[in-house]
Amino acid sequence: MKSIILFVLSLLLILEKQAAVMGQKGGSKGQLSSGSSRFPHRHRSQHYSGQKDKQHTESKGSFSIQHTYHVDANDHDRTRKSQQYYLNAQHKTTKSKQHLRRRQRLLNYKQKGRGRVKPKRHFHLIVIHRKGGQVHHGTQNPSQDQGNSPSGKGIFRQYSNTEKRLWVHGLSKEQASASGAQKGRTQGGSQSSYVLQTEELVVNKQQLETKNSHQNKGHYQNVVDVREEHSGKLQTSLHPAHQDRLQHGPKDIFTTQDELLVYNKNQHQTKNLNQDQEHGQKAHKISYQSSRTEERQLNHGEKSVQKDVSKGSISIQTEEKIHGKSQNQVTIPSQDQEHGHKENKISYQSSSAEERRLNSGEKGIQKGVXKGSISIQTEEKIYGKSQNQVTIPSQDQEHGHKENKISYQSSSAEERRLNSGEKGIQKGVXKGSISIQTEEKIYGKSQNQVTIPSQDQEHGHKENKISYQSSSTEQRQLNYGRKSIQKDVIQSSLSFQTEKLVEGKSQIQTPNPNQGQWSGQNAKGNSGKSADGEQDLLSHEQEGRYQQEFSGAHNTVNIEHEVAYDDLLTQQYNEDRNPIST
């Protein structure tokens, strides 16, 4: 390119010198001075516009050259020199035509291709003013040939067309607005890009679907589908076109910001959704998390039934209050049965948090976190007279075989505060056992009773499988002076506790907790024998002792009741000669 430009400049300087010499010789003869008035002169001008490569134009900048040639056609003595001059000019014009055609191709390619052609404020001009008429001896007019050439005019028109376009801040002439949307489109040839800016108000449940698609040579590269259902105000804002400058290249880059704002009465919810979902055939990971928090407030005359279904456990709490008289019924069938075989590991976890507030003068807070165990606390208040009933059949049965590992852990923490002048705090941490404490306040008379039916049965044999099922159904109806009816159907464990309060007199009834003990040797089971004990009625100032001894078993349960005004109840359990005091 540099060599061509230098060659053209050198030729123009030579021609200018020759024209100056010819002008001086013609002026000495007085032909040029008189010829200006005698002969009609034709002034033709041709505009050449060319463009260098983008790199060269940026490095050197634009330039403009203007040359004026004065030719006298009536000078017959200088025909040879003029003929040679025009032959050289014709040769030069042919090269300039080729050069300009090449430039036109480059311009068309850049406009259609990936590059962007910026219009130049300064054009490359070569102006030839021809003076005189026709040239003899068959010489052709180079200016006429160049005037008829489509290359120079085509480029000039092309510049005028590009100058008409709007390349400011990435905006084009085509702008459309529909439903509050502004669409800016920038064309760079075969590539096109779209920028959307939408703001809509959604009152009810509607679906908003926005697709930003970019087409590159007939292939869709980026397709974004957004489908959201909201009730409230939804606002989707994208950057407008004058803020983002789209660059065309082998890869197209989109910058998108999505903000979803949902307003629904008293709820302020902001969601930023970004999902990268990878589906593979190997190494799948699925995680589930669940948390429950329940808070209940009970008033007079309300009934509430709560059912929590977790893994292997069902807890139901029913509370009824009739005319200030409270009846509580708790029925809990709980089974943790695990059958393990060779090299099997099974672990269960369940967590529950409950907070209850009773408006009849007593407040109870119970928080139980247990694995495979259930803790229950019931409170009743009838005209200042309290009745507590706790019935918990619980079995933790472990069947271990060869190389089996099963671990159970249960922890419970209970804290109760009664407004009738008495506070009780119990914290029990045990494995496979359930600890319950009930407190009663009757006109300054306290009665405490603890009943723990707990069985930890482990059966380890070879190739033996033993399954246990326990189901309990309790139905109690307590009135002010009536008796209580209790029906319990339990397999492998029974625990009963009934309490009656009649006009300030305390009656405590404790039936027999049955224990079914299984011992198997080589797939043979022997069932133990149980004997029922006695039932004692205790008044509010008497002392009673109730002892039960079981035949065919190694367990001994000793229960002592002491009823006084401010005395505490002491209970002792001896299981397999291991004392446990609460």
Swiss-Prot record:
Region (Disordered): 25-62, 131-156, 173-192, 272-477, 502-554
Entry superkingdom: Eukaryota
Lineage, highest ranks first: Eukaryota, Metazoa, Chordata, Craniata, Vertebrata
Keywords: Repeat, Secreted, Signal
Quaternary structure annotation from Swiss-Prot or TrEMBL: Interacts with SERPINA5.
Underlying gene: SEMG2
Protein name: Semenogelin-2
Similarity field: Belongs to the semenogelin family.
Comp. bias intervals (Polar residues): 137-151, 174-192, 325-335, 385-395, 445-455, 466-477, 506-529
Compartments, record wording: Secreted
Main location class: secreted
Signal sequence residues: 1-23
Record's GO cellular component terms: extracellular exosome
Keyword Metal-binding carried by entry: no
Role summary: Participates in the formation of a gel matrix (sperm coagulum) entrapping the accessory gland secretions and ejaculated spermatozoa.
Keyword set includes Lipid metabolism: no
